[in-house]
Amino acid sequence: MIQIKNLKKEYRTNNTSNLVLDNINLEIKQGEIFGIIGHSGAGKSSLLRCLNLLEQPTDGSIFIADENITKKNSKQLREFRKKVAMIFQHFNLLSSRNVFENIALPLEIQGIPKSEIKKRVFELLDLVELPNKANAYPQELSGGQKQKVAIARALALNPLVLLSDEATSALDPTSTKQILALLKILNKELGLTIVLITHEMDVVRKICDRVAIIDKGRIAEMGKTLDVFLNPQAPVTRSFVETSIHTKVPDFIAKKLQDNPYSYDNTYPVVQLTFYGDKGKMPIIAEISRQFNATASIIQANIETIQDQIVGIAICHITGERQGWENALRFLSNQDVNLKVLGYATADNI
């Protein structure tokens, strides 16, 4: 659906230049929700705006539905932009127009007959669950309702792709939940490809099929959302994941961990176990005690939801005779769970 090849974007002013996108390569599949996350200034907004050529790339190419959009002239671009809609953080509704008129605007610009406009607008109002708000003005709506109107307007011309530029950043938690649920419905019912940028990892884990993490203009990491959350590779990815799910060892414990199991007498492993799906049904901690005469004391445990998957994350201190806990680690490494040895600590130091 979307292919980005060797994309670069450079801003030049006088004798200075600022490279904000550096050799971006990625492919977004038709019908998926693809997240792009990064800190402020990482380049994510510039990348999104290149996808509808609001920003002209300095180099590289972008293909959408097998069309090289970077080669289009102004007239061709106007036609192409009907296929790629966009919603924004601050809604961009016209305060002088009511809800009906805001949604109708792109249809009016295309010269659609009034009878067809009326039918289409009310279809969209039903779709975004605002059937009784046609005559309301933006100032009479909540933030979540305004974003729903913006989404309806974006869908007026039946686009193939919806670009979302921090669409939930200005919303309260309840409205954010409603907008994300709506985007998932639109994705499934309309087969709509959605590309969203955000700085909120919670948004990514709730609705994105895959995610790319951008750092300093480059893709630091990319993959399926569940894989990225459970096994982040890049430091910037780990920092984002830690803001969304509780994978980080508490600082007061981390300070006590040793890298070497033989640093002191009676030093035992502190491990992180991650379960998801049916894996969480296995009585692994009980098995450690039963089979190896070792004890797994839970330091911290959390249940998370990532892409509709239940994920359990437990940090445990495994104590006992050295042969026992070494055998327990070998046992865990052969089970269908993610095992990470975080360090070693004495029994009385945790």
UniProtKB/Swiss-Prot annotation:
The keyword Translocase applies. Signal peptide: none annotated. GO terms for molecular function: ABC-type D-methionine transporter activity; ATP binding; ATP hydrolysis activity. It is a peripheral membrane protein. Residues 2-241 form the ABC transporter domain. Part of the ABC transporter complex MetNIQ involved in methionine import. Responsible for energy coupling to the transport system. Its EC number is 7.4.2.11. The complex is composed of two ATP-binding proteins (MetN), two transmembrane proteins (MetI) and a solute-binding protein (MetQ). GO terms for cellular component: plasma membrane. The gene is metN. This is Methionine import ATP-binding protein MetN. It comes from Francisella tularensis subsp. tularensis (strain SCHU S4 / Schu 4). ATP binds at G38, H39, S40, G41, A42, G43, K44, S45.
